Amino acid sequence: MMRASYLFTSESVSEGHPDKVCDRISDEIVDLFYREGPKAGIDPWQIRAACETLATTNKVVIAGETRGPSSVTNEHIEHVVREAIKDIGYEQEGFHWKTCDIEILLHPQSADIAQGVDALQPGEVKEEGAGDQGIMFGYACNETPDLMPAPIFYAHKILRMIAEARHSGVEKVLGPDSKSQVTVRYENGKPVGVREIVVSHQHLIPDMTSAQVRERVEPYVREALPKDWITKDTIWHINPTGKFYIGGPDGDTGLTGRKIIVDTYGGAAPHGGGAFSGKDPTKVDRSAAYAARYLAKNIVAAGLADRCTLQLAYAIGVARPLSIYIDTHGTGKVSEDKLEKAAAEVMNLTPRGIRSHLDLNRPIYARTAAYGHFGRTPDNEGGFSWEKTDLAEAFKRAV
């Protein structure tokens, strides 16, 4: 049985965190292939990308496997990378969008992998299989309007609000690199307040003190959190090391796929281990995790549970999921068996079915690279389609 009263902590990192810079670059390259493919007459279903990025002092290295239009040259990729770094805001001596060295090591996808992933020609019976084996989890709960756990939801919100102020020019002395951490107090299983707040934020004036940084960031923290959650007993940790002038890849080397808990549920739910960024949606690490969130969110949105964890499992080259598992943590209005059966009925959970249902063969991935892949608002370009609750009624009928 779940404890009634406890503390739970989640962290977030900003778009300027070194690992997130790499996630953004990797996803920009995925988007580039999806933008340029149709222009070259290539079917979006045939696009493939698995792109890893390393960023360090004045150096970016990109490696991986791709399949797409020959019009995507290294010069094209380099331009996209520099624009991404510029948009994040890096114009520092140790990492500048104009002058950093960019090395590109992309090559075609393995034929051995392709033969198990690609569908055959029209009229043949084999359906495309999963791009790899693995387990993926989705989760939803009714703690926030977006059906996300409160700690990660508010950790993201704090940094997103500060980033918006920085981009608008209001906070010119703050740099791109930052981290947040929120310890939420639960009573009777519900979030009711914040015990501890951590914000470490890069500053562009070398001798800024922690107190001066707090003057800048505290208003955004207070605006991000529910009004009565911060009290006189709330403990603040703002730039607790005292100085955060050297930031981004100049301060710490970044890699794609290193912030998988930040990307998902902040530790409030299991994680299958696979990262998202840099991967086209034939990689079920990404697409099936999106589908699992979509199904879990719709179960909660339908009022069939207050909390829902959903697991999917796949084998490389095999289309159907090997298993579907649902746990409603004692909050379900119907049995988990019925929900598992309903999940298989309301959505085609083959890799192709997921890509089709969620319309994933499009350039929608760079926007997911920071502030979480879940708990976001679906946009007009098709981004965050897995956050829709349009299956809620179908679930109600199916159970």
Swiss-Prot record:
E.C. no: 2.5.1.6
Residues annotated to bind ATP: H17, D177, S178, K179, K243, F244, D252, R258, K259, A275, K279
Binding residue positions for K(+): E52
TM helices/strands, residue ranges: none
Region (Flexible loop), start-end ranges: 109-119
Pathway: Amino-acid biosynthesis; S-adenosyl-L-methionine biosynthesis; S-adenosyl-L-methionine from L-methionine: step 1/1
One GO BP: one-carbon metabolic process
GO CC field: cytoplasm
Keyword Transport: no
First-tier enzyme category under EC: transferase
Binding positions for Mg(2+) per the UniProt entry: D19
Cofactor(s) of this protein: Mg(2+); K(+)
Cited PROSITE patterns: ADOMET_SYNTHASE_1, ADOMET_SYNTHASE_2
Catalytic reaction annotation: L-methionine + ATP + H2O = S-adenosyl-L-methionine + phosphate + diphosphate
Cofactor descriptive note: Binds 2 divalent ions per subunit. Binds 1 potassium ion per subunit.
Keywords, comma-separated and alphabetical: ATP-binding, Cytoplasm, Magnesium, Metal-binding, Nucleotide-binding, One-carbon metabolism, Potassium, Transferase
Molecular functions (GO terms): ATP binding; magnesium ion binding; methionine adenosyltransferase activity
InterPro entries tied to this protein: ADOMET_SYNTHASE_CS, S-AdoMet_synt_C, S-AdoMet_synt_central, S-AdoMet_synt_N, S-AdoMet_synthetase, S-AdoMet_synthetase_sfam
Binding site for L-methionine: E65, Q109, D252, K283
UniProt-annotated location(s): Cytoplasm
Family per record: Belongs to the AdoMet synthase family.
The protein, known as: S-adenosylmethionine synthase
Native source species: Bradyrhizobium sp. (strain ORS 278)
Gene name, Swiss-Prot/TrEMBL: metK
